[in-house]
């Protein structure tokens, strides 16, 4: 979006950002006041759906997002009205995860956020979800840059120099598997081992 938006107490008025996340296996929508106060937070998990496959299946995940996206958005608007008297027209900007993540999944949340921005004539803010991992700490702590961060998520393990919440430099990262991927491989191997032991008991 070409619209500019000033966020925070220094802007002189309250800001309400609706953020949509759909990078992997959870469809989430939240509304945050002035960057710190969560007035709505809705998550639709797909854990049970993917458990039978031993991991996230991208095509199934994307379909699940499509089924859940309108539900979580409607619930977020309902929570915002109940908790703070906020209507959809009061939203200052709409944000959506642009990556990294599963392409089909990302598109669901991204299209929803951009559509809402268009309908309500508000700015759209694209968010890198790794950056969001860092910024999320500011919701309930007074953690302010500059600082060094160790980011460990499902697909990334990085050491980051955080100059500000909008400017970070990756100082180092794993060159093959991230810690989360290593955990996943161990879990899959263990599951196969347990299945083999169970089968042996039956013979």
Describe each region flagged by the PLM.
Residues 191-198:
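Conserved small/polar residues in nucleotide/adenosyl-binding loops
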Residues 177-190:
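Internal alpha/beta core interface subdomains
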Residues 17-19, 95, 105, 147-151, ...:
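Short glycine-aspartate micro-motif
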Residues 27-32, 149, 157-161:
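Short beta-strand scaffold segments in enzyme catalytic cores
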């Amino acid at each position: 979006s070409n619209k500019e938006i000033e966020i925070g107490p220094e802007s002189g008025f309250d800001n309400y950002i609706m953020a949509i996340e759909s990078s992997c296996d959870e469809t989430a929508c939240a509304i945050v006041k002035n960057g710190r106060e969560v007035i709505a937070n809705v998550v639709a998990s797909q854990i049970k759906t993917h458990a039978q496959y031993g991991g996230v299946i991208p095509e199934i995940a994307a379909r699940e997002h499509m089924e859940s996206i309108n539900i979580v958005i409607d619930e977020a608007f309902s929570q915002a009205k109940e908790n703070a008297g906020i209507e959809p027209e009061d939203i200052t900007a709409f944000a959506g995860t642009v990556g990294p993540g599963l392409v089909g999944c990302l598109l669901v949340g991204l299209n929803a956020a951009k559509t809402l921005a268009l309908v309500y004539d508000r700015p759209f803010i694209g968010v890198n979800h790794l950056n969001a991992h860092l910024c999320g700490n500011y919701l309930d702590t007074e953690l302010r840059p500059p600082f060094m961060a160790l980011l460990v998520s499902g697909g990334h393990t990085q050491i980051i120099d955080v100059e500000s919440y909008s400017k970070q430099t990756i100082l180092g990262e794993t060159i093959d598997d991230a810690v989360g991927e290593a955990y996943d491989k161990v879990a899959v191997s263990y599951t196969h081992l347990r299945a083999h032991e169970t089968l042996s008991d039956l013979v």
